[in-house]
């Protein structure tokens, strides 16, 4: 313990020995002084210890209706998928709270398959679920995975991403959510098992089986391939919720063929024509996934199948404007920081939606379209102090015309911002 003061009579911190002139604040107690730096250090130590002792529990898991309501704030449409996800997630964490057994009845895990076109909201739904539940969340790309012994990522690297998202708190990671994207890309190339190796297809499905079902996996802390004499992080995947998403391009004819066969048998081609193109995926069954190329054991690990519909023009316009973090609101906020008001005319929003449909990118392509439209504006406006308002019109999107700019004196410019 340091003396309270030095030879010059200056007060000192009793812990680090710094004088009152070397620190911002010195707090006095009964026979002791402590500086602001030591207080901050002590606070960090206490918080770390409390975080370690805090057991990860889910006593107040939102009810399915509440989960759906929160999803509605961020994701437009897709009501059936939201309901399926809300129920599956609620049951999953209810199962964790019950320690997987109720009166000796073991509750099985319900991983989820999300099937829908690109840009329909699969990843956003999974991300929002993790945010609602405040659990670690990781996204993995199935196309980068290969089975053990081949060039590519081991499936255990998926778990490493979750551990990293949990700041290496393994107990917390063991109750997280992993979203595996592009799972349709690991379908085997034909319905019949082949004697040749399918390194990026069936082999990956086989490798994923154990972690989907629940196992204690050994994860290399630095990622990459496993090798002998290496330290591993042990993680139990029993309570990790896996959501596997994919576009499953080409599954529609499989579904139509089955629907035709089941309904009238001979002459099913005619019946297929009556199936609503937009709602084909709503009829998907495990047997369709089997014909598509997923192996039976893998399908069995994904008992909940939720489909997402393609987004139409109205849905895309709603996505641009209605969610809490809608793109229009984001760009309006960006320009507001430069003291400029941004307005999107209704015609502009409709044209943006049409472009996204033409490009077949769904909601995912909306940002890139707006970024392209706003490039010149966002380049010029920070240097222009005379502009009060920027208006994107139908012509701005459809004909690549310059946005309307309103000056502070009310003058409207229809030319480029450099005018």
From Swiss-Prot:
Gene Ontology, cellular component aspect: HslUV protease complex
Positions contributing to Zn(2+) binding: 13, 16, 35, 38
GO molecular function list: ATP binding; ATP hydrolysis activity; ATP-dependent protein folding chaperone; protein dimerization activity; unfolded protein binding; zinc ion binding
Gene3D superfamilies recorded: 1.10.8.60, ClpX chaperone, C4-type zinc finger domain (6.20.220.10), P-loop containing nucleotide triphosphate hydrolases (3.40.50.300)
Protein function: ATP-dependent specificity component of the Clp protease. It directs the protease to specific substrates. Can perform chaperone functions in the absence of ClpP.
Species of the source: Bacillus anthracis
Keywords linked to the UniProt accession: ATP-binding, Chaperone, Metal-binding, Nucleotide-binding, Zinc
Domain ClpX-type ZB: 1-54
UniProt xrefs under CDD domains: RecA-like_ClpX
Protein name listed in UniProt: ATP-dependent Clp protease ATP-binding subunit ClpX
